[in-house]
Amino acid sequence: MATSSHLNWLIIRNNNAFLLKKRDVKKPFSTEPNNLASVSSYRYSGIVHKKTLGVVPAADKKGFTAVLKKGKYAQRPAKNTVRVDFKAGPRRSLKKLKNLLIGSKYRKDLTQAALRRASAVLRSQKPAPVKGKKAEFAKGKKPE
């Protein structure tokens, strides 16, 4: 017999392997997969919900991958995840992700969090700007 997601959350909320408690922080963090905010809360939990959403960097470090869990195959772990790659460029990829989530009406409450996580992943893949003397050498000028 399947239990509700609320009951599952009440059971695991204070004690699970993904919980990360820090000193002087009221709300504990979470390291569980498909948790967009990395916060231990019912809304973002990737364990208790039938439909979850995760955004991870793509395998080749160009773009990101959206990992969706199908509610239909909740009892079949091998079949219940779908991975969608987004590599078209930052703005286009974010627009495609938004269209995917809004068009399919898949967890409307996670749309904004997914866009923020995808944007952070794309920002982390940008090369850092070179500053100082190294920048002058990169431009072809010699420092004086």
From Swiss-Prot:
Residues 133-144 have a biased composition (Basic and acidic residues). One of its GO terms (cellular component) is cytosolic large ribosomal subunit. GO terms for molecular function: structural constituent of ribosome. Keywords: Ribonucleoprotein, Ribosomal protein. GO terms for biological process: cytoplasmic translation. Pfam families: Ribosomal_L28e (PF01778). Residues 122-144 are annotated as: Disordered. PANTHER family: 60S RIBOSOMAL PROTEIN L28. Belongs to the eukaryotic ribosomal protein eL28 family. This is Large ribosomal subunit protein eL28. It comes from Drosophila melanogaster (Fruit fly).
